[in-house]
Amino acid sequence: MRLYIDPGTGSMLFTILIGAISSLVFFGRKLLLKASFVLHGGKAVKSESGDRIPIAIFSDHKRYWNVFQPVCDELEKRGARAEFMTASSDDPALEAEYQYVTTRFIGEGNAAFAKLNMLKADVILSTTPGLDVYQWKRSKYGGYYVHVLHAANDPVTYRMFGLDYYDAVLLSGNYQIGQYRALEQKRGLPAKELRLMGLPHMDALAARLQNAGTETHEGRNVLLAPSWGINGIFSVYGASIIDALLAAGHHVILRPHPQSLTSEKEMIDALRAQFPDSDRIEWNFDNDNFEVLRRSDILISDFSGVIFEFSLVFDKPVIYADTSFDTGPLDAWWLDEELWTFTALPRIGHALTKEDLPRIGEVIEHCLTDDAFAKARAEVRDETWVCRGESAALIADYLIEKQKSLTAPAGMPEEAPAPQAS
């Protein structure tokens, strides 16, 4: 005897099965987190003196020290007690010498999150999305969670619900306020505190460039720095784009995304074998991208944050790959308007297509000599990089005043915060 299950019932049973499996997975993950917490001390993270931390800063990777160092420097200048916590054992922050700001390694992965989930701090600053969505949970001991951007583009391009459980988000452009308010309205979220504070890492990059002086070289240096994945330039164009650049007579600098060295190792190894280092080609894997950006005349990339650093800080043209962009998993999926990034890129650069490859030399010269691109860079800079040169100081003052307001005894007057409200 055969049993028949109609499609509707089958679908329902399948949904129930998936739900049960998901519940078991999340329950198991919760047990692992608790076990990890016990194994790594089983205590709430407090300051080294044992008190509640006034200002805590968390970085999930050493690459974000360029975002936090300017802020830590400003907190140090003000004599504000703060603790910087990193999930990278080789974070440059651990070598910093401060009197008032403490830096420490709190473990990697779940070990770090287990400690953060028991954090005792008044204000917590981070650039990591996904708070209270993935392993990192809001501490049961409270705290005011503040997110700072690490790229000059749309904050709604984080994975869905990326910033939902932060109390405040520090932004770099007015358009971002409109995006986030629209997102809150669409999803029925309570309005969070949005403040225009700029981009500390880009301010620091600009100051470094000003102090570095002029760099000169012969010919054209073309930097090819794609992101990784199936829509990345190397995946879409392969060796053909490198051949085209060499045929145009340029010096080509190839800088793969760090993730490519792991996820696309076979492809990168094949390209390195086909195009070894020479007087015409160089592969660049520097941790710090400042020098390679400074000595490049033009950048070819895709939807990577480096496009805006190169264009807006170094004031140079870009060519961006015209590849697909799926908003399905992102907060941007909820919005009706086009992302700001896609309105900015056509103004500051040229959209690369396969038809451009035979004439890539002409495209490069056009981008380098057309004054319209330079004018557009100034416009885009004003749109997405406010408070230039002041960001770290503004953020430090904001954190100090926020901590004071949260801990002020009832009935006591509070000092007015910095005038950067949304």
Task: Give the location of each predicted region.
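N-terminal signal-anchor transmembrane helix
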Residues: 37-53
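Conserved catalytic-core segment of nucleotide-activated headgroup transferases in glycan assembly
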Residues: 63-79, 200-271, 350, 354-357, ...
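Catalytic binding pocket for nucleotide-activated donors in carbohydrate/polymer assembly enzymes
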Residues: 191, 305-383
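Short, strongly hydrophobic alpha-helical membrane anchors
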Residues: 1-8
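Donor nucleotide-activated moiety binding/catalytic core segment of transferases
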Residues: 266-308, 313
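Active-site and donor-binding regions of nucleotide-sugar-utilizing enzymes
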Residues: 54-206
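C-terminal alpha-helical cap of glycosyltransferases
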Residues: 388-422
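Catalytic donor nucleotide-activated moiety binding site of glycosyltransferases and closely related
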Residues: 86-100, 247-283
